[in-house]
């Protein structure tokens, strides 16, 4: 079924004309990203040349997607917007709240019961306001979007940082916070700083054990976790045509791990075949008709350095598998060097669990190639040394994989087939372990591997690889095993080698839908109820407006040391149940951040009691006494998920300022949307001047203006002071949000 066909017809009917107008204004060859961005300006009158990395631009995305953990807060905000229906096609996907424990059937039953209040709320709000609703078990948001909604040349936003997955079908798909999604759903302009462009030239074709996952694992090592910040990664070159649409999606998905605004590939035959295989021949035909404009112009490809801000070249034919980690996705190591790294760093060598699936690697091709490794266990009389967990990406993938024997291949080697949901990838894993703090190693085909993320254990060394490499290491049970060259000892004592993985890009007999789990909206007669006594859901009260004064004598809540992701700021896992209740989820605020003064988590000095207490509890005491506070952090603060709770919680607990060395893009926007002051050090050495007992003043707010620095004064306990300037990236509109108390208040 083709969803929103009228919208798609209108889009493609006007696409060439819009491109023509863009060419007339810019007067130069265009990259694919530019074509999509400039044809999605909020109003034709906005068409002019914008400076990349500097100018803020108003856009009109084509659609919105939300997952159940972030949709709660987004829809609570949408309810307050006073609209009768959404302005653009929108969907909600129930994939984050299902805990992986016993297997798909019992886990979905448990989730349905334990999350009934939240699911009913999301279903009713969706039905009331014209939003498509995908039930628990239907699939992971990004796989379902790729199978049903993504289209070449389009633009979408999603309340999940891995929304760029849709770039595998040539779409500019951007992860945002809920407040941004509300802007789009209410028909307002959606603002974004015009991204810089990183061009990645792909040459050759993959071979052997190398997979699309290895392209982005290698690139993560080149760019690091913040190298793509405020940039779009655009892939081009002859190598792109050798990759399947789902392989392209894998690469775009993990662009989030380098901080990229989004990633995308040019339209080609592989995308066309995928659209047709997923029941969208009509969409493929419309894209074919404008295919010349669904890729970078020939002049761009011929001289990329003249059009991209940075160009990186990767030869696919020379690429080997990578294994990234632990604790950060940019710790990239080719498999030929990985054993040496494991031994040199003393990582736990024993591979304890292999996990495949997630939104990054759960396509038909992924499972097909992994199953080809699993089948060799019986064929070569091997034993499997570690447990295997499989999360299919959607019900369509699961049902088709079951029909084609892949699920059986996994079950035969002892795998547990979990729900078509995120599960362990976002911390929804009730792991079978007798010691939750034991030092151990796991390897996954997921996208992130932050400490505590998968199972809550800070000593779990999580590594990221392709599904086929995960399978090989699961069989071996040894991180030092290299399937490209090492042999295994089978049950007969013989040395055997695993064959190179193989698998079909798409099912030769077509997909089978299984039980798709889609619920179309019913309309305005649906009543929305929120129990005021609920511990899961809470209607939102507006945040107070700025009082017109400088922030004076604020105690330091925490000076965070090292990596401070959204997982550190607002943990997922068991806390997901409170994602619709701001007061309750605020109890986890910054509990994972490391205090620079004692090296501990969730233990900060409380000025009121002169004792060390939890971060949230301390902030609550300050709030109760009418005291504002400040958080100080290092680089790339807010890296990771799009969850706006990481911005709303400090706002709710009266934290006024986040002062960091740098911010991750989505989180910085989320802070601004909630009326927070997000500023950065001009001289990063000033971070070291901040002392634990300081009272901190931020002045200059009466003259708050774009490009004008603010002043921070540190009042030290010994009576001395330090003062320095800090910078910000607020424009006039965002300063308006700050003054109003939030973007919603400023409507």
Report the location of each language-model feature.
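Long, structured ligand/cofactor-binding scaffold of large enzymes
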Residues: 8-11, 15, 20-195, 579-631, ...
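Mobile "lid/hinge" segments at catalytic clefts and subdomain interfaces of large enzymes
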Residues: 3-4, 68, 151-285, 382, ...
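Extended active-site and interfacial segments that coordinate phosphate-rich ligands
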Residues: 167-195, 467, 569-588, 651-656, ...
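Acidic, glycine-rich flexible loop/linker segments
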Residues: 488-505, 667-737, 744-746
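Flexible inter-domain linker/hinge segments
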Residues: 5-7, 16-21, 27, 36-42, ...
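Extracellular/luminal Protease-associated
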Residues: 236-241, 624-663
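Accessory "access/gating" subregions that flank catalytic or transport cores
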Residues: 109-113, 118, 123-127, 131-157, ...
